[in-house]
Amino acid sequence: MGSLIQTPSTQTAVVTTAEGRHQVAHGRRVPSCGPRSVLVRIKAVALNATDHKMPARVKREGLTSGCDFAGEVVAVGEQANDEPRRCELPRSWAPGDRVFGVVYGSNPGQPEWGAFAEYVEADPIMLCHVPDGWDWETAASVGGSVHGSVALCLFGDGNLALDYSNLKAQADSSSADAVTNQSPKPESFTKEELRKVVLVYGGSTACGTMALQLLRLAGYTPITTCSPRNFGLVESYGAVAAFDYHSETCATEMKTYTRSSLVAALDCLGNTQSAALCYAALGRAGGRYVALEKYPDSVSATRKLVKPSWVMGPVMFGRELQLADGYSQPADLAARAFACDWYPLAERLVHQERLRAHPVTIAGPSPPVGDKWADAILCGLQELRDGSVSASKLVVPVAA
C-alpha cells in the first residue's frame, strides 16, 4: 500500500444517533485503507438534503455521515488502481493527489464510511481529480453525489434513459466549444425538437443546475421550475425557459410551451407538490418521470401512461442499501457499471470547464479552526432541515 503521511489513530466525526439525528463524536477510529480503496484526508465537505434525511432512514447510532468531499490522497490500496483502469476512460491514483468525490455515508454496512470526518476510506471509482485553479470548497461542492445521481436519472436505463452520445463526443473533443447546442425557439419547434425538451423541476437546486448543464451538453432543451428570483440563475446554467412553480397556471404554461408534447421530467425534490406538477406538465401521450426521492404513490397512480422511477445515488456503489421506510434496495450491478463509465467522463468534463459548480456558501470558519467544522456541519444540516437554504450549496472547510 502506498502511503504519503503517517495518519493518526483517532479522529472527530459527525455521526448518526438512534433517534435519527446527528451528533459530534470524538475519538473515532480513523479507517484503514482497504486493498481496493484509497484513504483521503478531508479538506472540505458539502452538505446535501440526503445528509439530514439519512439518519431517520437507518435509525442506527454511530454511523459516520456525509457524502460529498474534497481532499488529499494519503494512502492507496494495492488493488485500488485495478478497477478504474477497466473503465472506458482509465485513471489511476497516487498519494498526494487532490481529489473530490462521494462516499455512502450513514451506512449500516460500513459504519466508518462517511465524509463528515477528518479521514475517509473512498471507493476509487467514485473519485475525480481536482482541476488546477479550483479550491477545496469548489471541489467539494461538485463532489460526486449530485452529478452521479443526476446522470443516473437522466441517462440510466430504467429512468429517463436519454441518449448522451453527444455529451461523450464533447468530452472526447479537445476544443471547449467544439460542439454547441443552440436550442430552437418554442414557436419553431419541430416534432423531433419537441421530443428533446426535458423538464427539470427544481432548477435552482444543486441537482437542478447540474441537470441543466448535462442536458444541454447532451443536446437536449431543458426547461425548469423555480422562484422568479432565480430565473437568471437557471438560465445561466442552460435553461431555455423557467416557470414559477408557485403559480397556479405553472403546469398549463409548460404544456402550452411544449404543445402538450413533453415526454420526460426530472424531479429534483420528489414531494407531492413537485410530482403532481411534473405529471400535469407531461403531454397527453404520457412519458417518463424520475425523481431524486421516493415519489408519492398517490401521484404516480393518477396517470397510467407515465412511467415513474426514482433514484438513490448510493446504488452506484454496487452494494445493498439497508434503509427503513421503503428505501432499502438490493445491490444494483447495472448502476455500478454506469458509475464506472460516468465518473471518469464527469472528470473530463470538469477539467474541460464544460461543467461548473453550483453557487457556494461557506459555513463555519475559513480557514478551519480545530474541530469547529463539526459544529458548523450540525448547524448547516439544521438549515437544510428548516428549508432556509436556497440556490446555494453549503460547504464546510475541514482542514487547511
Curated annotation (Swiss-Prot):
Extent of the signal sequence: none
Q: Which UniProt keywords apply?
A: NADP, Nucleotide-binding, Oxidoreductase
User: SUPFAM superfamilies recorded for this chain?
Assistant: GroES-like, NAD(P)-binding Rossmann-fold domains
Q: What is its EC number?
A: 1.-.-.-
Q: Which GO terms describe its molecular function?
A: nucleotide binding; oxidoreductase activity, acting on NAD(P)H
Indicate the enzyme's highest-level EC class: oxidoreductase
User: Source organism's superkingdom?
Assistant: Eukaryota
Q: SMART domains in the record, alphabetically?
A: PKS_ER
Q: In which pathway does it act?
A: Mycotoxin biosynthesis
Per UniProt, where does substrate bind? 145-152, 313-317
The entry marks the following residues as binding NADP(+), namely 50-53, 204-207, 227-230, 245, 292-293, 389-390
Per UniProt, subunit arrangement is: Monomer.
Family label? Belongs to the zinc-containing alcohol dehydrogenase family.
Q: Any idea what this protein is called?
A: Trans-enoyl reductase ucsL
Origin organism lineage? Eukaryota, Fungi, Dikarya, Ascomycota, Pezizomycotina
